[in-house]
């Protein structure tokens, strides 16, 4: 039999679930993605300060200076890098933004960073994050016609958690799009 207290707790929990689901499902619009990646560069490197793509991927200090946006709404099955067609509507926003940017600036380059939460081994999370970033690139190129030359991928596993926890947290399972053409030789 439900007491008032039990009912109140159950009601609060039930009301919180749709909010959490809505937060997870929120996808930035193409205009928002475009605006973030087209914002004025935070820093302008001199030509002799520019680095290789490989070095850029290894330098958190440079990546933090690059224009970026976190995408937390692409849902992957647990332990999987496959992107189902049900996610294509979300990915279409990314594709539209990238295509508009590339029409204006064919030299634009975007790094797709894969991130995981801390559940599982460090190695398996590293591999999974790399596979998810590659899967998103493949989908953008094959399904939406984004030129592959404009995209690079990297996985960081659980290295850059947004929420510092060893437990499962959806905010840590994300893709970050980072504009890097201002940083490379």
Language-model features and meaning:
Residues 2-67:
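N-terminal targeting leaders that direct proteins to extracytoplasmic destinations
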Residues 16-19, 100-103, 145:
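A generic secondary-structure boundary signal that marks alpha-helix termini
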Residues 66-71, 86, 93, 105-107, ...:
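Extracytoplasmic
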Residues 80-113, 141-142, 177, 185:
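Periplasmic peptidoglycan-binding/anchoring modules of Gram-negative envelope and division proteins
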């Amino acid at each position: 039999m439900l007491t008032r207290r039990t009912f109140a707790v159950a009601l609060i929990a039930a009301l919180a679930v749709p909010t959490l689901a809505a937060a997870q499902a929120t996808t930035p619009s193409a205009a928002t993605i475009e605006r973030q990646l087209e914002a004025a560069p935070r820093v302008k490197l001199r030509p002799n300060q520019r680095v290789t793509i490989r070095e850029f991927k290894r330098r958190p200090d440079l990546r933090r200076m690059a224009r970026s946006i976190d995408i937390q709404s692409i849902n992957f099955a647990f332990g999987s890098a496959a992107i189902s067609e049900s996610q294509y509507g979300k990915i279409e926003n990314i594709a539209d933004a990238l295509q508009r940017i590339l029409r204006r600036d064919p030299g634009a380059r975007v790094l797709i960073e894969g991130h995981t939460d801390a559940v599982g081994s460090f190695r398996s999370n590293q591999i999974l994050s790399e596979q998810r970033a590659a899967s998103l690139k493949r989908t953008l190129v094959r399904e939406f016609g984004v030129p592959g030359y404009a995209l690079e991928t990297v996985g960081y596993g659980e290295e850059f958690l947004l929420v510092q926890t060893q437990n499962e947290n959806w905010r840590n399972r994300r893709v970050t799009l980072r504009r890097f053409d201002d940083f490379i030789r």
